[in-house]
Swiss-Prot record:
Protein name (database record): Cysteine protease inhibitor 8
InterPro entries: Kunitz_inhibitor_STI-like_sf, Prot_inh_Kunz-lg
Function comment: Inhibitor of cysteine proteases. May protect the plant by inhibiting proteases of invading organisms.
Keyword tags: Disulfide bond, Protease inhibitor, Signal, Thiol protease inhibitor, Vacuole
Organism per entry: Solanum tuberosum
Length: 221
């Protein structure tokens, strides 16, 4: 009888070991190969897609558009008689704000194993792709100013000028791959990008409420 108890104990121990081993290979602990892209939790990061269903690529030109009815594309303008335009605005379906938008390019924070595509919740810099004078050549990268407005004048490499892209669950007729933008400065919590009217202009702005944001889609320029 003692020998039977010992045998039962050994069989039970082996079974528990196999169960524990099997659990280590569930979806809670995905295997990430050296060539895949992952975050700090070792999870594979999906690609961001444009309206044609193609991944966004670093250095390629895109129009960022709010797909909601009455809204429009993001563009650069000079609204303060400054030497360089620095206002990041949003077109609308009213005469004074009609337009096709200003193309942007995405620049990665640093070289990594992410390849040449933009992935969800990875740090990028957003830069308007526009012809500019030598004086304004460094005034095309997005940043957030002290009023929490999105403006240009940022710097690639500045940890406070980082943005990220997150997928939303919004279903908008005729649109696919709907996202939101977040401003993610170093050592601070990310904030959604929303919109506001300031001095008569539709501006992009950071918002504190997690549920308050404007959706965006990306269109190849």
């Amino acid at each position: 009888i003692p020998s039977i108890n010992i045998l039962s104990f050994l069989l039970l121990s082996s079974t528990l070991s196999l169960v524990a081993f099997a659990r280590s290979f569930t979806s809670e602990n995905p295997i990430v190969l050296p060539t895949t892209c992952h975050d700090d939790d070792n999870l594979v990061l999906p690609e961001v897609y444009d309206q044609d269903g193609n991944p966004l690529r670093i250095g390629e030109r895109y129009i960022i558009k709010n797909p909601l009815l009455g809204a429009g594309a993001v563009y650069l303008d000079n609204i303060g008689n400054l030497q360089c335009p620095n206002a990041v605005l949003q077109h609308m379906s009213i005469p004074q704000f009609l337009g096709k938008g200003t193309p942007v390019v995405f620049i990665r924070k640093s070289e990594s194993d992410y390849g040449d595509v933009v992935r969800l919740m990875t740090a990028v810099y957003i830069k308007f792709f526009v012809k500019t004078t030598k004086l304004c050549v460094d005034e095309t990268v997005w940043k957030v100013n002290n009023e929490q407005l999105v403006v240009t004048g940022g710097n690639v490499g500045n940890e406070n000028d980082i943005f990220k892209i997150k997928k939303t669950d919004l279903v908008i007729r005729g649109m696919k791959n709907v996202y939101k933008l977040l401003h993610c400065p170093s050592h601070l919590e990310c904030k959604n990008i929303g919109s506001t009217f300031k001095n008569g202009y539709p501006r992009l702005v950071t918002v504190n409420d997690e549920k308050d944001f404007i959706p965006f889609v990306f269109i190849k320029a």
